[in-house]
């Protein structure tokens, strides 16, 4: 399909709600066998969020909700990561913790008294289907936070910023 688009001289961007920087997803796609020239046209929700975080939340302490595999998102400012939610200025949500991937009540209890903080959600998807398994995504945690009265900034499809930043 991408070859046909290029032959037709059509522009394209591969948009993904992966909560990781572009280079992480590009390396993944290369390992799958995607031609390197096509990998240059990748834009992730994580990359768009990262640019925003560096400009708006520079040097502020954050608490991460999500699995360790997403740590590469904030590697360039990891010195501001705190392990105590009360010490944070804001929350970055990239997904669910591996040991609480099916228990949304855990997140309701974790966040219920923290709605004074802003949450940045790097993947607004509520669920993802992996084969025959349906798994919750960061958007499910963000929705809980919003339902509690918290304020969430979303990065990824279908929210506008991923389209304007990727163009």
Predicted regions and their residues:
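HAD-like aspartate-dependent phosphatase fold
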Residues: 1-167
